[in-house]
Amino acid sequence: MSDYFEELGHEPTGPLGANDLARNLKRLQVLAIMNGIDMEIEVPEASKRAILELPVHEIVKSDEGGDLECSVCKEPAEEGQKYRILPCKHEFHEECILLWLKKTNSCPLCRYELETDDPVYEELRRFRQDEANRRERENTLLDSMFG
């Protein structure tokens, strides 16, 4: 059977070979979640662009002795250390958060999600955000109608 597909210039699983199967499985999982089926999917790492755009805060003497502590390693801030600031405004040691964001795309404290390079996961993120916005508009409307 594979000779038939090779003769036509196609792989039996698609142009990307076995990767097509994995991509399609993930797409089906996302569609299932969008349709209300409760399931877990693997969360990809944060995109390289999102990581590069994180602002850096270098600790100076006046910052020391404050309440700033890296929530990943639990070490207090010291002069000369570099902290990265996530869009949610939480700060972490540069080394700690870069290692964290290579495993997942969310803040260790509040789970704010940074963008990823995975188009299927990004579609799910947009869907979740649209649903949250829809619920907020619905609640606002109901509050205005029924006080």
From Swiss-Prot:
Enzyme class: transferase
Keywords (A to Z) from UniProt: Metal-binding, Transferase, Ubl conjugation pathway, Zinc, Zinc-finger
GO cellular component, one term: cytoplasm
Keyword Calcium: no
EC number(s) reported in the record: 2.3.2.27
The family this protein is said to belong to: Belongs to the RNF181 family.
Protein's name according to its UniProt entry: E3 ubiquitin-protein ligase RNF181 homolog
Organism: Drosophila melanogaster
